[in-house]
């Protein structure tokens, strides 16, 4: 797999009221147990993730969690273990999804895609089980339950990846394949070539199970190839599990040329059951001990001096000198003005005003466990490009448990302002002219309403809030790994 994939390392080998709900398709019924008593002084919930890159050690979170991996036999067993240990609060909505994942876990036992080629696939008796598409609001535990499921899947050929990173990898593969084709001879028409099927075949040989976090479609280039790509993956026997903030019907809502995207929804539903996880609680915003002050307002007195002092204190613990650093990212150089060991001191301009992307932020996450990010502005539709980069940056930092110390112009809750200004309206008018769109036809498009950004901003605010907690800070300490 390409290095841009952010993979989950499986840790397991190392180490109420009678509410009922039914998963659409798999038929698994959930009967919620009475909530277990919570010990005094114990938090109801501890969010965690075991996602990391292949080259890094797993971000183990708690001794109880590791014990669960050693003694439990599936995601449902694991969930009950953590509840009894008062690491989690029993949530009937999560339990319903866990039961669906438990059923899929059992269905996957012994399943594998034959790697010998088309002939063996045609005569294989192993029919792939239906995957699962889990959707719901931010912070409800979608990523957590998928990570529990993933940790117990025993097949070797499995991948756990952020959906945005996966699509970046697909486009790179397409580009690489096209570059390898024979050049067109002068005077001859170039032969049309469809790279999607061979790319899907390539991915299928690498993974029988694909687990996607944050399944969302905002890019027209992605939208136009998804149906063909996933149709080929599914026909090759790949099983998909995905989490998303949106139901399948709302994917790429109001996007350009959405009519060409809609058939993908039917393909997704044909091969995946859908289940909603929506308890109405954002567990990332629960009351947990803060890790000191990690988020400053630029209007505060001496904020630069305070952050300088914090950097110096962390730098003293590093076996390195404070100096500029250059990281290599896919043949390019990513220059940082100030770093020391695994601590980097950056400005928003350095990381989000420049044309950087997920691969750059992933490389940062691999090299640094603590990053200072200064002078974050308030985001509106006028600076949506920088806002999207910031969202991608936080997603990568959060996935790899990078600790951040920030200064920003507004509190976290006010970082994203959904309001149109005159300059934004003028930019929209220019873009509408370039695309040949009328006012009426453009009114509902998400690229003009900012609808997709609003969904992503909600996730980012939720994650930034959790990143201020003592628990998150301790989990990001790589010196303990």
Curated annotation (Swiss-Prot):
Compartment(s) of residence: Mitochondrion membrane
NCBIfam families tied to this protein: ZapE
A single Gene Ontology CC term: cytoplasm
Quaternary context: Found in several complexes of 140-500 kDa. Interacts with YME1L1. Interacts with COX4I1. Interacts with COX5A. Interacts with TP53; mediates mitochondrial translocation of TP53 in response to genotoxic stress such as mitomycin C treatment.
Main function: Putative mitochondrial ATPase. Plays a role in mitochondrial morphology and mitochondrial protein metabolism. Promotes degradation of excess nuclear-encoded complex IV subunits (COX4I1, COX5A and COX6A1) and normal activity of complexes III and IV of the respiratory chain. Mediates mitochondrial translocation of TP53 and its transcription-independent apoptosis in response to genotoxic stress.
Gene label: AFG1L
Pfam families: AFG1_ATPase (PF03969)
Residues the entry annotates as binding ATP: 136-143, 209-214
GO MF entries: ATP binding; ATP hydrolysis activity
Organism name: Homo sapiens
Parts of the chain that traverse the membrane: none
Name the record gives this protein: AFG1-like ATPase
